[in-house]
Design a protein with these regions (language model features):
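Short, well-structured alpha-helical segments in soluble
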Residues: 79-91, 110
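Structural motif
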Residues: 72-84, 162
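Short Gly/Thr/Asp-enriched flexible loops that form oxyanion-binding sites at enzyme active sites
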Residues: 105-115
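A charged, well-structured terminal subsegment
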Residues: 148-183
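Glycine-rich phosphate/diphosphate-binding loop of Rossmann-like nucleotide-binding domains
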Residues: 33-54
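Short beta-strand elements in bilobed, periplasmic/extracellular small-molecule ligand-binding domains
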Residues: 58-73, 144-151
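N-terminal amphipathic/basic leader segments beginning at the initiator methionine
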Residues: 1-24
């Protein structure tokens, strides 16, 4: 007896090819880069991303944050239309914060979608949802896809704590977005 397993992303199955095709070329540094931020609607995500964007500009010479969008639903991966907007507006993307099961899975799928479109992406998940993220990476055909992990939870942090977390994760975010800039 066989059972049909449905892909929760609503997309056709992708062959398990590792990270090939899911890893965009990295710039050597962020000087002059246009930064895109994708807010998944979770509490504190936009504050965190905005702080990261500001730090990328002030400390790594990024040209600025050129696009910020908020997803309509944290649990649904972005579509090709959103990816195309980012392709035209930025050079690198930071997205998150995955701090629940469905939003973590969608954040990983979003990062993979950006990468496949040629945009280096730094995805931030909390440590409580690593299995969910890894499962989605496998479903998307990129089982070795990497993201930045932070302590759970994010939603209950004060604004100052969120900013502190952004500063703490900044070196990992820079490393995820670049091929060689020391963090």
């Amino acid at each position: 007896m066989s059972h049909t397993i449905l892909d929760p992303t609503g997309r056709a199955a992708v062959a398990d090819t590792g990270v090939q095709g899911a890893h965009a070329p990295r710039p050597s540094g962020l000087t002059g880069a246009r930064v895109g931020l994708l807010d998944n609607t979770k509490h504190n995500a936009l504050l965190f991303l905005t702080e990261v964007g500001d730090l990328l500009v002030s400390e790594y010479g990024a040209a600025g944050v050129s696009i910020i969008e908020t997803k309509k639903s944290f649990s649904v991966p972005i579509d090709d239309e959103i990816v195309a907007r980012y392709q035209g507006a930025c050079d690198v993307v930071v997205t998150g914060v995955g701090d629940c099961g469905s939003c973590s899975a969608a954040a990983v799928a979003d990062g993979i979608n950006f990468e496949r479109a040629g945009l280096p992406a730094a995805v931030v998940l909390t440590d409580a949802f690593l299995t969910t993220g890894r499962t989605m990476a496998k479903v998307q055909g990129a089982p070795d896809y990497e993201w930045i992990t932070t302590q759970h939870p994010m939603a209950v942090l004060t604004p100052d704590q969120v900013k502190e977390r952004a500063r703490l994760l900044l070196p990992e975010i820079v490393q995820a977005l670049t091929a060689g800039e020391a963090a």
